[in-house]
A protein has these predicted regions:
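ABC ATPase nucleotide-binding domains
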Residues: 109-142
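Conserved ABC ATPase signature
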Residues: 13-17, 21
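H-loop/switch region of ABC-family ATPase nucleotide-binding domains
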Residues: 72-74
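Catalytic Walker B motif of ABC-type/P-loop ATPase nucleotide-binding domains
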Residues: 38-42
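Hydrophobic anchor residue at the start of the ABC signature
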Residues: 27-28
Length: 142
């Protein structure tokens, strides 16, 4: 609870917590089991940017300590902070590779059917959608 800054709510029922507070308690629960592998679906949902950053640092520390973190993230800028990315659509893997690889960025554009500008800024990868739609037709089979 201290790692996710949720200690002050330890006596409150989960139903009385906000979405972000509840998410931080659930993340603390995931850490408490001390598993070598964490599988998470949208762990950063409902968290404000400072707590998203804190959790990204926590996940990085787990990996550096020899653990494995697998996470589903739909926010591309957050997903780009990982070492590797698997881009999926319609239940199929379209691409797997390093987050900083141009072919990964191309796969993201394909799956979102939208031009995405990926830039490295202040030590982080950022993804910004273009205001113009991708000119190609979507090539993903349902």
């Amino acid at each position: 609870l201290r790692t996710t800054q949720a200690w002050d709510w330890r006596h409150r029922p989960l139903s009385q917590l906000s979405g972000g507070e509840r998410q931080r308690v659930l993340l603390a629960r995931a850490l408490a089991v001390q598993a070598q592998v964490l599988l998470m679906d949208e762990p950063l949902a409902n968290l404000d940017p400072p707590h998203q950053t804190d959790w990204l640092h926590t996940m990085r520390a787990l990996v550096e300590a020899g653990g494995t973190v697998v996470s589903v993230l739909h926010e591309v800028s957050l997903a780009l902070q990982a070492d590797d990315m698997v881009v999926m659509a319609a239940g199929r893997v379209l691409h797997q590779g390093a987050c900083d690889a141009p072919d990964t960025h191309a796969a993201l554009e394909q799956v979102f059917d939208h031009r995405i500008h990926v830039r490295h800024l202040d030590g982080m990868w950022m993804a910004l959608p273009s205001i113009h739609r991708h000119n190609k037709t979507r090539e993903i089979d349902a």
